[in-house]
Amino acid sequence: TNALRILGAGSGLFVFFGDALKGYFALYLCDSIVAQTETLLFVPSDYLFLSLIFSFIGHCYPVWFNFRGGKGAATALGAFIFIDPYFILFPLLGFIFVFLIGRFVGLATISAFFVLFIQTFFIDHGIHHNLHAFSLMIFLCILFTHRSNIQSILKGTEIKL
């Protein structure tokens, strides 16, 4: 959202897709490496979720920028698209619904990741047995990275898009 506001729509979308691809390819590379490994300490899907968590943390707190990065939503979105592209349908609908009502991107993002977490209780995940825990972790991280947005909304100073 910051790139969109500062640089305009074209550059903002470029940054958004770049961040989403970062999350997607982090899991893609992890999956490729794990598939070639004979001895594993964890279940293969756990490596994907650990890759998700670390790509999210690396995006939010990059060493190269004095640990000041983005809020991680697009990176997490890309990772969840890798896990299952259909898995983001309801969160996307939740995002659109909340955004159209309030015009707050931060609130819509928080809502989308809450929907993502809630839907893990209703969808069969096959090999992704820890999806509940990791989607909760990502939701809590999204809440943490959006805490300034939450404070601004409560104060009435959040900028609508």
Predicted regions span which residues?
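Interfacial segments of multi-pass membrane proteins
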Residues: 2-8, 30-34, 54, 72-102, ...
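Membrane-helix interface "capping/anchor" motifs
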Residues: 62-68, 97-111
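Loop-to-transmembrane alpha-helix initiation sites
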Residues: 89, 105-112, 127-136
